[in-house]
C-alpha cells in the first residue's frame, strides 16, 4: 500500500479532455508521486475506463477522485471522496457518499478510500457552480474550516481548491498553520515552476491539472519541487 503522506506532487487528469500518448507518457514518467483522475463535467464510465487503461501501464499510484457514482469502478489504488464543506447543498457534503455506500458498501475496501475535506474558493469555477459553494470566505472562515477538519472531523486530507486561478497564498498559509494531523492539498492555477515552489512550501501536496492541457513543458517543470524539502 502506498503512503499518501509522502506525496508532494500529483498530476490531475480530466477524463473528458484529450491528452496525446506522448504527453501522457511524459506526465507519467515525470517523477510525480501519483496520477489522479477526476473532473467536473462529462465524467463517464467510458472515459474513466479509457484513461485508466492508458495510465495503468505505468508503475505509479493511480487515484480516482469521485465526482459521480456512475464513474466509480475497480482498478484504482485509492478512491478520494470529496466532501465540499462550503457547499450549500447536502448532496455534496455526504448525500452522494450515502448513495455510493448503499450501492457499493458491501464491496468497498475502506483502506483504499480517502475522505477529503474540500473548500472551493473560486466563485467563477465550474466546480463552485456545480457544488453551489459559498466562496465568499474570509481568512477567519478558512481557519475555522481547518480546525473543523483537523480537530473535529479528523479527516486525512483538506483540499483547498481554487480551480482555474492561482490562490491567495496568505489564506493557504493560514489554513496550513491550523493543520497538525490533516494533510493539506492545494490545487488551482499552478502554471509555473515558481508558483509550484511557492505553494509547495506551504501545502503538503500540490495538485497540477489545467496547465497539462495548455503547456506540457510548464506542467513538467512543476515536478521540480520534489528536489527540495518542504
From Swiss-Prot:
Coiled coil: none annotated. Mg(2+) binds at residues 14, 40. GO terms for biological process: glycerophospholipid biosynthetic process. Its EC number is 2.5.1.n9. Pathway: Membrane lipid metabolism; glycerophospholipid metabolism. Sn-glycerol 1-phosphate binds at residues 12, 159-164, 189, 209-210. One of its GO terms (molecular function) is magnesium ion binding. It catalyses: sn-glycerol 1-phosphate + all-trans-heptaprenyl diphosphate = 3-heptaprenyl-sn-glycero-1-phosphate + diphosphate. It is an enzyme of class 2 (transferase). The keyword Ubl conjugation does not apply. Its cofactor is Mg(2+). Keywords: Lipid biosynthesis, Lipid metabolism, Magnesium, Metal-binding, Phospholipid biosynthesis, Phospholipid metabolism, Transferase. Pfam families: PcrB. Signal peptide: none annotated. Prenyltransferase that catalyzes in vivo the transfer of the heptaprenyl moiety of heptaprenyl pyrophosphate (HepPP; 35 carbon atoms) to the C3 hydroxyl of sn-glycerol-1-phosphate (G1P), producing heptaprenylglyceryl phosphate (HepGP). This reaction is an ether-bond-formation step in the biosynthesis of archaea-type G1P-based membrane lipids found in Bacillales. This is Heptaprenylglyceryl phosphate synthase. It comes from Staphylococcus aureus (strain MRSA252). The gene is pcrB.
